[in-house]
């Protein structure tokens, strides 16, 4: 009987150890069991996560500067559909990447490279959603913007459908933009500040050329555009609309307040940007961000705050998500 008892004790002990190891593994793959993202989330589990991501982003931005606005735009597109869960990174015939607004996204290879390096340094630890969030911050800093601390601890989503993509549009009214941002728990200050991110990057000529040649079927440019700005845009946009135009003409690779200043003089290419100067509330915010109205606001500081708010939209934690092995496919 003593021998049988000993065997039973050994078996029970073994099963308890297996359960403990399994639970520990699940905690690692589920990024904290439901805790909200916070600064320093990975701690000693992946101490170099930020430096690894920054190194990869820096290399790609130096070789192709357009990767900086590309990554920033990708992060925005990710957060506005199912929250900041890396769903825009998933490949597939009907994934978010195939939706019309996402077909011109760039920088996927940057995120995949950062993920591969992190998998070697800290296997099954850092989510693709967190990598994209860090990369967006680094893209801003590398183009001259102000740094901010990034809360980490998001999980990767498992759902990505092109039919779910419903992003703010380039011709939206101020009221529509306010409505869309409010639906994502972002206020009007966040709206104006994040639109200020158009200080870097480009837009497809096909999206904007109509405003400069046939606004609302009139056969004339939008009368609210500075007339001297029209020939500059048409020179960049051929009739077939097959190229891209700078969102912040003459300062496309520098993150600063130049774009917001151009909004005040009606020298911006997107109608959704131009109308922000016509609405009293958004106009007042622009003036404060430019130091033209008191109390003034620091654009760099406010941009970081709004990016953090956006990065916490509908984050996945606990059993709601996973940590992908590669960013383009669920496990």
From Swiss-Prot:
Its cofactor is heme b; Ca(2+). Mainly expressed in roots and slightly in leaves. Ca(2+) 2 binds at residues 199, 248, 251, 256. Ca(2+) 1 binds at residues 78, 81, 83, 85, 87. Keywords: Calcium, Disulfide bond, Glycoprotein, Heme, Hydrogen peroxide, Iron, Metal-binding, Oxidoreductase, Peroxidase, Secreted, Signal. The keyword Hydrolase does not apply. One of its GO terms (biological process) is response to oxidative stress. Glycans are attached at residues 93, 216. Heme b binds at residue 198. Substrate binds at residue 168. The record marks 73 as: Transition state stabilizer. Residues 1-23 form the signal peptide. One of its GO terms (cellular component) is plasmodesma. Its EC number is 1.11.1.7. One of its GO terms (molecular function) is mRNA binding. Disulfide bonds join 46-122, 79-84, 128-327, 205-237. Binds 1 heme b (iron(II)-protoporphyrin IX) group per subunit. It is found in: Secreted. There are 73 peroxidase genes in A.thaliana. Removal of H(2)O(2), oxidation of toxic reductants, biosynthesis and degradation of lignin, suberization, auxin catabolism, response to environmental stresses such as wounding, pathogen attack and oxidative stress. These functions might be dependent on each isozyme/isoform in each plant tissue. PANTHER family: PEROXIDASE 25-RELATED. This is Peroxidase 69. It comes from Arabidopsis thaliana (Mouse-ear cress). The gene is PER69.
